């Protein structure tokens, strides 16, 4: 069975248009407004990315770093991110939602506990910016077992050989 993310890309391809994927950081503005923001952008977006803030977002640009800083100042915690997702998915079950963030928070919570929270809140996919291939293989397998897409990143400097391996191992 295809994932919601794959079905969404299929739908966009059939309509001969690119998918609109939006991004916001949970808790930037306020915890309560995060849900309102997701609901508003979901009316136009095909897939939503929701960042879980980290205190040292070194792989992100200035805009996301600033958003993460504001979210943390607003007191956002990982448990709050899952509550936001769960509330959003209550009325938007078919809209794919991808969490994006850093492995340190997953490590602190424990991979299995983190993935359990992802599944129970309705997360469809994960982007973990600081967990590269092949170090991510075990975590990727755990995601696959739980039907959570693990989205890996490529850069313009990724070699063709490495790209083939990453694509082969993606789901």
Roles of regions detected by a PLM:
Residues 1-12, 54-66, 73-86, 106-112, ...:
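Active-site-adjacent beta->alpha loops and helix N-cap segments on the catalytic face
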Residues 8-28, 61-67, 89-100:
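N-terminal small/glycine-rich loop or linker at the start of catalytic domains
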């Amino acid at each position: 069975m295809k994932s919601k993310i794959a079905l969404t890309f299929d739908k966009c391809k059939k309509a001969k248009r690119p998918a609109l994927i939006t991004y916001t950081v949970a808790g930037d503005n306020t915890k309560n407004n995060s849900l309102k923001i997701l609901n508003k952008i979901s009316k136009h977006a095909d897939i939503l990315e929701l960042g879980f803030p980290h205190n040292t977002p070194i792989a992100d640009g200035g805009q996301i770093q600033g958003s993460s800083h504001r979210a943390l100042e607003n007191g956002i915690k990982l448990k709050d991110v899952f509550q936001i997702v769960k509330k959003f998915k209550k009325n938007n079950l078919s809209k794919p939602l991808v969490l994006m963030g850093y492995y340190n928070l997953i490590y602190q919570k424990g991979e299995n506990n983190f993935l359990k929270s992802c599944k129970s809140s309705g997360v469809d996919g994960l982007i973990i910016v600081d967990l590269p291939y092949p170090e991510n293989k075990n975590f990727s397998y755990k995601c696959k077992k739980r039907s959570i897409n693990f989205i890996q990143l490529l850069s313009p400097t990724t070699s063709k050989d490495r790209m083939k391996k990453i694509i082969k191992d993606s789901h």
